C-alpha cells in the first residue's frame, strides 16, 4: 500500500539550477516530506578564487528557504574522483571520447546519492532531469521527457529497475518554458539563472587547457589515411571524430575533418569533405550494455538509437552478444560514430537502455583508424 504524500519522504538532488528548484517546489506543493540535498562532487575554485559550487549551494539555500524545506550539502568528491573523473581521464588516454554525464548518473546521482538518501529514511529520490518513469506491465519503464529539446534519457541509459523504483522526475512531463514560468511565478531565486553547459567539472573553462593539467600534451603529426602529412596536432586526446575546427589545415576546397587517431603512434588522421567515406560507418560493437528492464533480449530486434545526445533517432537492428555487449547494425551509414560515447536504444517514447561504443565497422570491416 502506498503511503500518503505527507508520510512519504523525498530527497531532492539540488544543483542550484532552475530545474531541480522547480522539482523540489512541485513535490512540496504535492504534500511530500521534502529534503533538499546539494551534491558536492568537485573541488572547483576558478582563477579568481571563486568556487562555483559555493555559489550554487547559496542558490540551493535561498530556494529551500523560499519553499520551506530543510537542506544540507553532502560531499561525494572522493567517489566522483574514483568513479567518474578517473574513468574520464583513462578513456581520453586511450584515445576515446568519454561521456562523464552517463557515468556520473550511474555512479553518483543514482548510486552514492541514492544510497545516502535511503540511509536518512527516504522513500524516493528526485532530480530535475527531463525524463519520465511509468510502472506498467509489471515493470518500470523510462520514457523520454515531454520536451524533445531537453529529453535527458540519453544520459540515464544505465539505470535499471532498482533505481527507477526509487526515483521521481517531477518536471519530466513539462516543457522547459513551463519550468521557467513556474519558477518565476513562485519568485524562486533561480528563476532567471542560465542553464549550465558542458562538463560539470570543466564549467566555462577551455577544455584543452583543463585536460593538459592532467594529461600532458604530446604534439605529433596529422596525416591522411594515405600517409600524406597535413600538419601537426597538439595531442590526439584533444580531438574527437568528426571535429572540423582547430585543425589549421590551409588551402582551398572543402573543409577537413578528424576521422581517426592512433594513440600508440601519436598520429591524428584527417580527411577532406563533409561526405568523405572515412567519416561513415555501418555498424558498431557496444560494451557494458544495460537494459532498463534488467532483462537481456534473447534475439536480435529492431529499434531506434542515438549515438550522441543531440542526434535524431536512427533505425537499427540490435544483436545482443553473449559477453553482455551488442552489435548494432544501422539502417543507413552513420557519420562520425565515436568510441567512448554512449549508444542508447529506444522503442518510441521508451528508453530501452544503452552501452558504450567500443568498435566501429564499415560493411563488416573494423575501422582500424577510429580507435
UniProtKB/Swiss-Prot annotation:
Span list, region Interaction with target base in tRNA: 99-101
Interaction with tRNA (site feature) positions: 129, 341
Cellular component GO terms, alphabetical: cytoplasm
GO molecular function per UniProt: ATP binding; tRNA binding; tRNA-uridine 2-sulfurtransferase activity
Highest taxon, organism lineage: Bacteria
InterPro entries found in the cross-reference section: MnmA-like, MnmA-like_C, MnmA-like_central, MnmA-like_central_sf, Rossmann-like_a/b/a_fold
Example GO BP: tRNA wobble position uridine thiolation
Annotated compartments: Cytoplasm
PANTHER family associated with the record: MITOCHONDRIAL TRNA-SPECIFIC 2-THIOURIDYLASE 1 (PTHR11933:SF5), TRNA 5-METHYLAMINOMETHYL-2-THIOURIDYLATE -METHYLTRANSFERASE (PTHR11933)
HAMAP family per record: tRNA_thiouridyl_MnmA
Record's function text: Catalyzes the 2-thiolation of uridine at the wobble position (U34) of tRNA, leading to the formation of s(2)U34.
Protein name from the UniProt record: tRNA-specific 2-thiouridylase MnmA 2
Lineage, opening ranks: Bacteria, Bacillati, Bacillota, Bacilli, Bacillales
